Every structure is written in structure tokens, then in C-alpha cells.
Curated annotation (Swiss-Prot):
Family: Belongs to the RuBisCO small chain family.
Top-level taxon: Eukaryota
Organism the protein comes from: Chattonella marina var. antiqua (Red tide flagellate)
Protein name: Ribulose bisphosphate carboxylase small subunit
Alphabetized InterPro entries for the sequence: RuBisCO_ssu_sf
Keywords: Calvin cycle, Carbon dioxide fixation, Chloroplast, Photorespiration, Photosynthesis, Plastid
Subunit structure: Heterohexadecamer of 8 large and 8 small subunits.
């Protein structure tokens, strides 16, 4: 899930996965 992709688009995919 990339619900945070919009707000965390500046972060790496690894961080995006951790935010989930």
C-alpha cells in the first residue's frame, strides 16, 4: 500500500513500507 506516497514521496520506498 502506498497511501503515504503523496506525503512521503521524498522518502525512500523502505521508509514508506515502515510507515504502513
Amino acid at each position: 500500500m502506498r497511501l503515504t506516497q503523496g506525503a512521503f514521496s521524498y522518502l525512500p520506498d523502505l521508509t514508506d513500507a515502515q510507515i504502513i
